[in-house]
């Protein structure tokens, strides 16, 4: 079970503390060659695995995948984990950890299956919990795509690269956490709105983004 960290009115679910730093650690490795985000590929990597990558993938992510013997191909079928996997894991943990209904659950759009699974579990007890997915307003970042295929009931909030960078710096300064840009943006949104933020993706994989800014 990953811990909560309170930040103002927000509760941060620290999925970046999982063994490979991502909420994708919670799902089994696909049995076929599929297309994944960089953090998904790092979580599901095994020796000899082959993946295609989608979205923004940093130098550090590529280097780690090479170190673990992962082969990267240009194209494969898109893949999204089953939300019910997250309902049974992430959602069950949230129900155990929360004593009252959160106003919302927010996470980057790349973790949309986790968001849907969490809502599936939480709404059995608290039907009015709002779901929020963050998408990129300008330059796509790891786990922060420009669009998503989530249901219309999920609110989409656009986050710019500069806003994500400020959120990352603030989370590091105030909480001592080295979070990803997308995870920090989710934390900052929940800090202003209340609710639960899913903070996934360790920040050490994204220093090259700051060097390129």
PLM segments and residue spans:
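PLP-dependent amino-acid enzyme catalytic core
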Residues: 1-213
């Amino acid at each position: 079970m990953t811990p909560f960290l309170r930040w103002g009115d927000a509760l941060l679910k620290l999925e970046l503390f999982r063994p490979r730093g991502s909420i994708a650690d919670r799902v089994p490795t696909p049995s076929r060659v599929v297309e994944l985000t960089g953090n998904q590929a790092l979580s599901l990597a095994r020796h000899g695995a082959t993946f295609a990558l989608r979205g923004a993938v940093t130098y550090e992510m590529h280097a780690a995948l090479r170190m673990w013997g992962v082969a990267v191909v240009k194209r494969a079928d898109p893949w999204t984990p089953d939300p019910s996997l997250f309902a049974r894991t992430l959602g069950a943990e949230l129900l155990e950890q929360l004593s009252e209904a959160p106003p919302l659950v927010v996470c980057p759009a790349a973790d949309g299956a986790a968001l849907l699974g969490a809502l599936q579990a939480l709404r059995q007890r608290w039907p009015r919990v709002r779901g929020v997915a963050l998408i990129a307003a300008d330059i796509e970042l790891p786990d922060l795509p420009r669009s998503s295929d989530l249901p219309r009931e999920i609110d989409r909030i656009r986050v710019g690269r500069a806003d994500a960078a400020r959120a990352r710096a603030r989370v590091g300064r105030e909480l001592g956490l080295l979070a990803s840009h997308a995870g920090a943006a989710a934390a900052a949104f929940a800090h202003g709105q209340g609710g639960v933020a899913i903070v996934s993706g360790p920040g050490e994989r994204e220093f090259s983004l700051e060097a390129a800014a």
